[in-house]
């Protein structure tokens, strides 16, 4: 039996044309890159979720019920647990527009864009309603995983909000940065409400989402989901690929030399035997501005890298029942 080691990378040249840009110029350049994605039907989302939101145990990855590194109060099986009707939490899962569809009048292509559509518990989805995300000060309702609804009084905003758990706040922040970029200049007729004006985020929302983005960095889950959605829609979430771009657009770039992202090289795909020592190879990575590179390799569950911050870490190939494929990602800063 063999183990296939596959290196996930951003398609070469995908972000050409972004060199040296920041602010609104960068946002518009990214808009042109991720615009005009392949649009799928609303009913097809049930099938696509099986590629984009599957846990390692093959259950539905529901961010409104999951407890990372813990035991979720309940889990859903794809297809058989689709809503339907529900009378309470843990009955079934449905399709959550994290950017509520009423904010864009349920128009296409936003209503089926997988970058903001995720499977969630139907009842919790209903309790979230179309309230903005925020940080609850006075709680009126709490889900079984700790997501909550209530009133917010911070970031110069006071009103009813829905707060996901800390472990997924960065995910939703990067989703909102994507939506604000993908649909800028295409938001005619969109809603203005407490959090957004069309596709533009209001000042308090930018401040909060940047804090969420920084406190909950990009995870392996997001990296894998970004690749899965790219395979389906043909576009990517730039703020997962290059997290610094959120600051470059809505705040300030940390680098004084521009915002040209480093080029990651993860080495070739490999096919190895069980229990072999395998070396990853990031030596071909480079930075146009000659900045020092910080490596962070992400490995699939069950594989322990000897040093994930090394340019070329190693690991022992796992024992497998059948030939299996494992995806590794080289994330550079």
Predicted regions and their residues:
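N-terminal module-boundary/linker segments of secreted carbohydrate-active enzymes
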Residues: 6-70, 249
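Proline-centered linker/hinge motifs at extracellular inter-domain junctions
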Residues: 259-263, 313
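Surface-exposed, proline-enriched loop/turn segments that connect beta strands in immunoglobulin-like
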Residues: 265-269, 299-300
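Acidic, Ser/Thr
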Residues: 281-289
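Domain-level detector of nuclease and nuclease-like folds
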Residues: 83-256
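Surface-exposed, flexible coil segments in extracellular/virion-facing regions
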Residues: 295-316
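Solvent-exposed loop segments of extracellular immunoglobulin-like
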Residues: 288-296
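Short beta-strand segments of immunoglobulin-like
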Residues: 267-273, 284
């Amino acid at each position: 039996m063999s183990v296939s080691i596959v290196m996930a990378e951003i398609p070469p040249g995908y972000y050409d044309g972004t060199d040296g840009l920041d602010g609104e110029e960068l946002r518009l350049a990214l808009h042109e890159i991720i615009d005009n994605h392949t649009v799928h039907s609303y009913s097809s989302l049930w099938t696509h979720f099986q590629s984009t939101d599957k846990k390692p145990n093959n259950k539905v990855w529901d961010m409104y019920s999951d407890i990372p590194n813990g035991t979720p109060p309940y889990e859903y099986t794809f297809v058989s647990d689709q809503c339907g009707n529900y009378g309470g939490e843990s009955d079934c899962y449905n399709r959550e527009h994290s950017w509520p569809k009423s904010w864009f009048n349920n128009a296409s292509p936003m209503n089926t864009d997988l970058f903001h559509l995720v499977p969630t518990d139907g009842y919790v989805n209903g309790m979230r309603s179309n309230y903005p995300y925020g940080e609850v000060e006075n709680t009126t309702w709490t889900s079984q995983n700790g997501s909550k609804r209530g009133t917010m009084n911070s970031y110069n905003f006071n009103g009813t909000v829905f707060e996901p758990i800390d472990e997924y706040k960065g995910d939703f922040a990067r989703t909102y940065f994507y939506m604000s970029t993908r649909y800028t200049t295409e938001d005619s007729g969109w809603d203005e409400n407490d959090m957004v004006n069309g596709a533009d985020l209001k000042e308090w929302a930018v401040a909060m989402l940047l804090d969420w983005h920084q406190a909950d960095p990009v995870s392996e889950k997001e990296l894998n989901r970004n690749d899965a959605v790219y395979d389906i829609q043909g576009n990517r979430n730039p703020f997962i690929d290059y997290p610094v771009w959120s600051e470059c657009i809505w705040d300030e770039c940390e680098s004084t030399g521009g915002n040209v992202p480093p080029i990651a090289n993860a080495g070739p795909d490999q096919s190895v035997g069980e229990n072999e020592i395998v070396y990853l190879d990031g030596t071909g990575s480079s930075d146009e501005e000659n900045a020092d590179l910080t490596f962070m390799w992400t490995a699939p569950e069950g594989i322990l890298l000897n040093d994930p911050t090394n340019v070329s870490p190693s690991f022992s190939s796992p024992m497998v029942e059948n030939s299996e494929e494992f995806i590794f990602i080289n994330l550079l800063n």
